[in-house]
C-alpha cells in the first residue's frame, strides 16, 4: 500500500518529468534553423537540402506520432517517455559531431523522432496522473513546448558566434538527457511499488479512432492550426519584405508571432477546460486569422504589428487542441490513441503548408493564391473544431454511442 505522502511525491516527480520533457520537444527544430547557413558553408549542402531539413520535423512528428500509441502499449507510457528523451538527447549530441550531410540528416531524424514520440506520449501521461488538474498541468506542458521553440531561436547564433556552431547545435542535448533522469526515477519507484505494469487495453483502440468524428475533428483542428502556423513562420519575412520592410523588421515580427504563442499557452487550456463546448473560442481565433490574412494581403505595412498580433492569437487553437486530447477521452489509453491520431495525421498535413504556400506564390507572382490557401485551411480548421469541441468522448463516438461529458 502506497502512503499519501508517497503518492504526493510520486505525482510531484511525474510533474517534474513532464515539465522537463516539454522543454525538449522543439529544441532540435529551432536550434538548427538559425545556423543552417553556417552549417551549409562548412559541410557543403545546397539550399534544396536546407529545404529537406525544414520538412523533416513535421515528417518525423507525423510518422512517430502514428506509431507511438502502439509503443506505449508495448513498453508503457513512462518507459516510452524515457526512450523519447534518450533518442532526442543522443540525436542532438551526435549530429553536432557529423561532417557529412547524410549523417546530419539521419541523426536529426533520430532526435526529431524522439520528440515526435514525446509529443504524443505526454498528453496521456497528464491524463493518467493529473486528471484532477488537467488544465493546470496542460498549461505547464504547453508553455514548456513554446519555450523550447522560442529560446533556441534567440540564442543559437550568439552561442555559435562565441563557441562555434557545433557547440550551439549540440548543447541542447543536455536538456534531453536531463529530462530522461526523472523518468528513470519514476520507473524505479513503480518497480519498487509493484506498480510499473500498464493495465491491459484493447489493442484495436487505434483503429477505432479512424472511425471517430472526434478523432477526425481533432486531426483537422490540430493539423490546420499547425499548417497555418508553420506557413506563417516560414513566410512572414518574405511577405513583409515584398511590401518594403527590412529583414530585421521581418525577423522581429516572427519573434512577436512566436511570443504570442507563449501567451496563449497560459490561458487557452484553462479556458478550454471551463467551457462545455469551446467552439466559440475557435471561431474567435479563426476570425483573428482571417483579419490578419486580409491585412497582410491588402496593406501589409499599414499596420504590420496589428496584423501580426492578430495572426499570433489565431494559433491559440494549438494549446486548445492539446488540451482537448484529454478532455475528449475517458482513459489514458483513449488519450494515447487520440493523441497519436491527432498529431500523426495533423503533422502529415501540416508539413505541406510552407511548401504549397510558396508554390502558389511562385505560380502567381503574388500572395493572393497563397492567402486563399490559408483561408481554406482555416475553414477546414473550423469544421474540424466543430466536431472536436462537442461535449463527448472519443471512446463513445467510435462506438456510435455519444454520451455527454459535461
Regions found by a protein language model. Name each.
Residues 107-144:
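Cytoplasmic helix-loop-helix junction between adjacent transmembrane helices
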Residues 329-367, 374:
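A late C-terminal transmembrane helix in Major Facilitator Superfamily
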